[in-house]
């Protein structure tokens, strides 16, 4: 593979591997290679097939496989039997239904970095890494694993709402609740609810301007990091889905922002007034709502720089940039 010109985590210029800042956030300060010692699961080698079918498989959400990695002796490797994965590995999906599927890891990485760097949203630490055959994969550090290896209690919003396929149907992650209902979940379970309602509001706004229509109930969760209080977990699974889906939606949740649903037509989709009403409904002060909508209505030069330095193709960079700028404009 070609030598890198940007840190594959922070996207800072002048680095051919992970920068010191990235190593601190992801690896406890250890210098770690960005190249894995095995091939992509999309490669037909026996080694990659064994990994995909037998080692470290966590789940399959939609069409995107997830695997596990551990950090040992300065390298990321597959976990042995009985080892708890410290990192989640997401290679490019194999589904031919997706457009430009090999760039899914770069898309998720860019979107997560935009959230953290340009908008100050707390996110799971993340980066790109590369298989031995050169294919990129997305890696994120598990925030539900304590330093001693134990697991912090964590519940996604579908579980907290008591929704399953049995009582909510096969579309239960998307078709039952609204984002206003999600705010009620925060209010019910989080002691410092007002703080997390603001954090939630900002993530919903960010998902809108970055065209993430896969922010379903399992992509929000509450976590207790050992002090007995649940709080909104760091943002995860942020991605501009419009780059890969043939018929993208505006919101993942079919009801949209409001409990009664949203009537969207060819002449009215979503604008600033909808988010202002949403902010008020979930209990945020008007001045705070205005401040946040103003923030997300303004195109971030830092975000544009991240798009330009990302590992997307030039064509996808252009599409991402244009769609992001347009969504910001709709909030003015």
Language-model-derived ranges and their functions:
Residues 46-169:
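Conserved ATP-binding subdomain of kinase catalytic cores across diverse folds
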Residues 69, 115, 157, 214, ...:
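A residue-level signal for conserved active-site and pocket-lining positions in enzyme catalytic cores
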Residues 132, 136-209, 265, 274, ...:
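ATP-dependent phospho-/nucleotidyl transfer catalytic cores
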Residues 125, 282-295:
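Short, surface-exposed acidic
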Residues 131, 291-301:
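Small/polar glycine-rich anion-binding or flexible loop at a beta-alpha turn
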Residues 158-185, 225-286:
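Catalytic-core segments of enzymes that bind and process phosphorylated/nucleotide-bearing substrates
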Residues 102-119, 175-246:
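Conserved kinase catalytic-core segment
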Residues 1-47, 53, 188, 230-232, ...:
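Regulatory N- and C-terminal appendages and interdomain linkers associated
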